[in-house]
Design a protein with these regions (language model features):
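ATP-dependent adenylation/nucleotidyltransferase module used to activate substrates
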Residues: 1-158, 169, 178
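AMP-forming adenylation/ATP pyrophosphatase catalytic core
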Residues: 126-135, 142-368
Length: 368
């Protein structure tokens, strides 16, 4: 009997080819698009390459017709609001910089979709992510790097559970992007040349602050820009407008370029300093998800990534009694930002990951 797999179809070329590849491999494939955004705002998401709007549904439906597979649209709006939107807003309100795609992957694209898929008798779910599922000799499942480093998406998948990984297929991770487009062309898929989605799907204009203000109905108080000695340099528009390492939009004239070094919600201050002050070699990670191992030992060597675009750097990990991990990089890293994920790799797969809580800069003046 054929194994049944539900493929999360965003209307893009990657998930479309994932469905095609799995059908070619003999799976009983069902296509599903997750409706996650409010109807009154869906028009905002219908831009070319988007994954949340009406155009995504239309494109996915056309692909399913070509592949001759069943296709459904499932409503996950409540879960998306709870696990992604509310999280996004609350993190900015506490002066953290969140990664909503990571939350969406864990709690919506996997937890919610997997639960619904199992209810309809599926054995697996599948996506078009550039990553691979691997089972290690110790029996645990992990996420292994895609064959193409430029498209690798393992960073955003670090917090999937063992049960989720066991039930997941990721066929696209074995290919490079040009190969995926060529497969789509040869299969006659209508999205073969569709552009990739680049933005946070619910804030396509990048104006996070306006989105948060509209979502909460709150007005966020202006405050002071200060230097590291506490001298007032000017006025800021509200903490939600800023993130660590930011240079644009500060409105401060100086002889040398200035950047956001720290956000202080207790005093409603934004600390401004030079680029050199942004470098740290130590950070502390909370909410750890252990993937390749159940735990780590003091002195564990790894390659750490502290943002999606980070190439990764050698580091040493030490577990702490409070459940956090202390990470010390061999070389200082720029603008490690509270709220962002830190993901650690060994031998080309995810060891563990978590959320950056605090960092200690090279002067040691930002202790946890």
């Amino acid at each position: 009997m054929k194994k049944k797999v539900v493929v999360g179809m965003s209307g893009g070329v990657d998930s479309s080819v994932a469905a095609y590849l799995l059908k070619e491999q003999g799976y009983d494939v069902i296509g599903v698009t997750m409706q996650i955004w409010r109807d009154e705002d869906v028009f905002k998401q219908s831009q070319e390459g988007g994954c949340c709007g009406l155009s995504a549904v239309e494109d996915a439906r056309r692909v399913a017709a070509v592949l001759d597979i069943p296709y459904y649209v499932m409503n996950f709006k409540a879960d998306f609001k709870k696990y992604v939107i509310d999280y996004f807003v609350s993190e900015y309100e506490r002066a953290y910089t969140p990664n909503p795609c990571i939350a969406c992957n864990r709690y919506v694209k996997w937890e919610s979709l997997l639960h619904r898929s199992l209810e309809i008798g599926a054995d697996y779910i599948a996506t078009g992510h550039y990553a691979r599922i691997a089972q290690l000799p110790n029996g645990r499942y992990t996420i292994a790097n895609s064959v193409t480093a430029e498209k690798d998406q393992t960073y955003a998948l670090y917090n999937l559970t063992q049960e989720q990984l066991r039930r997941t297929l990721m066929p696209v991770g074995e290919y490079e992007k040009p190969q995926i487009r060529r497969i789509a062309e040869e299969a006659g898929l209508p999205v073969a040349h569709k552009s990739d989605s680049q933005d946070i799907c619910f804030v396509p204009d990048h104006d996070y602050a306006s989105f948060i203000e509209n979502e909460t109905g709150k007005t966020y108080e202006p405050g002071n820009f200060v230097d590291e000695s506490g001298n007032i340099l000017g006025r800021h528009k509200g903490l939600i407008h800023y993130t660590i390492g930011q240079r644009k939009g500060l409105g401060i004239t100086a002889a040398t370029p200035l950047f956001v070094k720290e956000l202080r919600p207790a005093t409603n201050e934004v600390v401004i300093s030079t680029n050199e002050s942004l470098f740290s070699d130590t950070c502390y990670i909370s909410d750890i998800n252990y993937m390749a191992q159940e735990h780590i030992t003091p002195g564990t060597r790894s390659i750490g990534k502290v943002r999606y675009s980070h190439r990764g750097a050698d580091c040493t990990l030490t577990p702490m009694e409070n459940g956090m991990i202390k990470c010390v990089f061999d070389e200082p890293q720029r603008a490690m930002t509270p709220g962002q994920a830190a993901v650690f790799y060994q031998d080309g797969h995810v060891l563990c990951g978590g959320t950056i809580e605090k960092m200690v800069n090279l002067m040691g003046d930002l202790p946890i």
